Amino acid sequence: MLEIPTLFDVFAEAGKEVAIVAVNGCSIDTIFRRRKVDYYSFRTDAQSFEMTKKLLEEDKYDLIISYYTSYDHLSHKHGPYAPVSEDALETAVRYFEELTALTDRVWQRADRVIAWVPDHGNHVVDEHSGTHGTNTPEDMVVNHFYRLRAAE
């Protein structure tokens, strides 16, 4: 478990409502436990995605972290460029686009930030698997995307 203060802690200590939505047992679900945030853990990414949409519609939270784990899992098992891994990445992009549109609709009267923040890269180990954690560009150089949107 990660014990240093994080963005989640800063928001919670400032009186903001924070939710972490993820697959049960994945890294994000486990390393940020024991914080003053609400946790929603599910068996699949699809269930996490549906809960994230529900939480956005309820408009209770100031910060929602929705973590998609399938690409990471499948790229370890099959390699980052395997068709099944690429399909999972396409699903992640589709989920992000849908959540972005929903956030813009639900939170249109609020200033907001939408962010796509991968936690690491990945490289091919052999023809059947991938991994991360080395000091190589494939593992260390990741693109983060964000958009600031003013209240309407």
Where are these regions (language model features)?
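Feature captures the catalytic ectodomains and active-site-proximal regions of enzymes
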Residues: M1-E152
